Design a protein with these regions (language model features):
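Hydrophobic alpha-helical segments typical of transmembrane helices
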Residues: 10, 22, 45-48, 126, ...
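Short, composition-biased local secondary-structure segments
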Residues: 14-18, 121-127, 175-189
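Hydrophobic (often cysteine-bearing) scaffold residues that line and stabilize catalytic clefts
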Residues: 61, 144, 148, 255
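Conserved nucleotide-sugar phosphate-binding/catalytic loop shared by glycosyltransferases and other
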Residues: 65-68, 163, 170
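A conditional alpha-helix N-cap/helix-loop micro-motif detector
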Residues: 93-97, 145, 164-167, 206-207, ...
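Catalytic core of membrane glycerolipid acyltransferases/transacylases, capturing the structured
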Residues: 109-168, 195-197, 201
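Membrane-anchoring hydrophobic helices of lipid-metabolizing enzymes
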Residues: 1-114, 158
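Non-catalytic C-terminal accessory region of glycerolipid acyltransferases
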Residues: 37, 56, 63, 105-108, ...
Length: 291
């Protein structure tokens, strides 16, 4: 085991020992310094929020930025929770599930099910839930840090999730799983590689967006649901939500437009919990907003 790997594991074990309500308070305190001190997370988040919410007053924008930095930090502080022994899954009422009936109905329809989510709340909570309840496959791009990759991959595999790379081999595996009437889950709000998407509006801005979902639905006839995870107030836990089925098939452009529209509606429910520190507008017809 490398020094970095040992360090990562020690941090995760330490964070796992801290009660979640205490982690929540730590997040509130530390995120204040993220807000007042210069840093790249603050810079990118602020640029994204200004682009998406140009009509916000300065005071409202600052409040949203501060909350956004808190929730971004919580994803880090929750690493012990989601990548450790996952004891939280046994706590009564810590995880609430909304509209699971919609997913159950789709699973009983003798078709594959494609779930997609934005990076909102903590998607590792979603992954752990899906792995504990269903035969689920998830495509992902491995982290560049090999030590972190080892921890993440082991945790997700232990959760019961089948992880595949986002290469041609992985896409073939996804197609097979959907045709075999299984579940595939994708965080499809990230900017895809050139050739793997189309330009589509996101909060009124033309951005390069993933076109994989409408292609998968068209090729397999699977049922598509948006799902997301949001934090409860005051460190009380999480809520996992499943929306009713939506149609992304047919014309690829229309399918991607519908996907982004669903993202917008989802994000507006808890805009402070979306990962605004990600460079969502790095491939766009607009002038770069990150300079």
């Amino acid at each position: 085991m490398s020094l970095y790997s040992a360090l990562f594991r020690s941090i995760i074990r330490t964070l796992e020992l801290i009660p979640y309500t205490v982690l929540f308070k730590i997040g509130k305190l530390v995120s204040y310094f993220l807000y007042v001190l210069p840093n790249k997370h603050k810079k990118i988040s602020n640029a994204n929020l200004k682009q998406v919410f140009p009509g916000l007053k300065e005071t409202e924008l600052k409040k949203l930025l501060k909350l956004s930095l808190f929730h971004s930090l919580m994803n880090l502080l929750e690493s012990g929770l989601v990548w450790g022994n996952k004891i939280y899954m046994k706590k009564i009422d810590f995880i609430e599930i909304e509209n699971i009936e919609a997913l159950d109905n789709s699973l009983n329809s003798n078709k594959g099910v494609l779930l997609f989510t934005p990076h909102l709340g903590n998607i590792e909570i979603l992954i752990n839930f899906l792995g504990s309840k269903f035969d689920c496959t998830i495509p992902y791009t491995p982290p560049k840090n090999k030590s972190l990759e080892s921890i993440v991959t082991k945790s997700r595999n232990n959760a019961g999730v089948n992880m595949v790379n986002t290469d041609s081999k992985g896409i073939k595996e996804i197609l097979l799983r959907l045709k075999d009437k299984k579940i595939v889950a994708i965080a499809s709000d990230q900017v895809p590689k050139t050739g793997a998407g189309v330009y589509s509006k996101f909060f009124g801005n033309e951005i390069y967006s993933m076109s994989l979902l409408p292609k998968l639905q068209k090729n397999t006839g699977c049922i598509v649901h948006l799902m997301y995870c949001k934090r409860k107030k005051n460190g009380e836990g999480f809520v996992i939500c499943f929306d009713d089925p939506i149609d992304l098939s047919g014309d690829i452009q229309k399918g991607v437009d519908n996907m982004n529209n669903e993202f917008e509606k989802c994000i507006m429910k808890v805009p402070e919990q979306y990962s605004w520190e990600y460079k969502k507008f790095k491939k766009t017809k607009l002038k770069s907003i990150y300079n």
